[in-house]
């Protein structure tokens, strides 16, 4: 299975490795040529067979907006974009609409596991249509921890729900870390 992955930082780099170990053919793009498999987003689009599935693992905010706009220009009808960065859930609907206007599907994925996800698997909280989630399940099955699906993957609702769940997860986690820190 051929996939694209944009953003090869600590997590994206390891996700590419885990997907490759799981039998996926992954082409990665990053502005840093020493880790990138292709030179540009256009090269990535041209190298992948349509319909394409591309995972985006870039920081939230302006970079995500710029990447979504760039992808709308180089993707075609039937493609699917998965935003796995820590995007704000309220930004997902506008990104999904921008892509939907071109016939491109969108899934938001809250990802937990950090750099340990390479060996342990990633906890995945995803939002999107049933059809888009089903299409991306081979990716999710490879990235999640081994064992029962529900131990590492949940489809929490429509577009935006995955990043909302990740926000709640982070709030609880950071609150617990603060409480532990206060106790010592």
Predicted features by range, described:
Residues 41-107:
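Rossmann-fold NAD(P) dinucleotide-binding segment
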Residues 30, 41, 85, 110, ...:
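Residues at the C-termini of beta-strands that transition into short coil/loop
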Residues 32, 59, 112:
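Short beta-to-alpha linker loops that shape the active-site pocket of alpha/beta-hydrolase fold enzymes
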């Amino acid at each position: 299975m051929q996939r694209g992955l944009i953003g090869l930082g600590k997590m994206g780099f390891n996700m590419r490795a885990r997907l490759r170990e799981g039998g996926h053919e992954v082409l990665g793009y990053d502005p840093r040529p020493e880790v990138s498999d292709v030179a540009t987003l256009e090269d990535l689009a041209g190298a992948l067979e349509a319909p394409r599935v591309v995972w985006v693992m870039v920081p939230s905010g302006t970079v995500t907006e710029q990447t979504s706009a760039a992808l709308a220009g180089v993707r075609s009808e039937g493609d699917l974009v998965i935003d796995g960065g820590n995007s704000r859930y309220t930004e997902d609907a506008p990104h999904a609409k921008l892509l939907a206007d071109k016939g491109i599907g969108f899934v938001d994925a809250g990802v937990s596991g950090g750099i340990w996800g390479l060996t342990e698997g990633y906890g995945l909280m995803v939002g999107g249509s049933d059809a888009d989630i089903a299409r991306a399940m081979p990716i999710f099955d490879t990235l999640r921890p081994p064992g029962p699906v529900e131990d590492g993957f949940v489809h929490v609702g429509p577009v935006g729900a995955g990043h909302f769940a990740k926000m709640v997860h982070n709030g609880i986690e950071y609150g617990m870390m603060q409480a532990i820190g206060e106790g010592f």
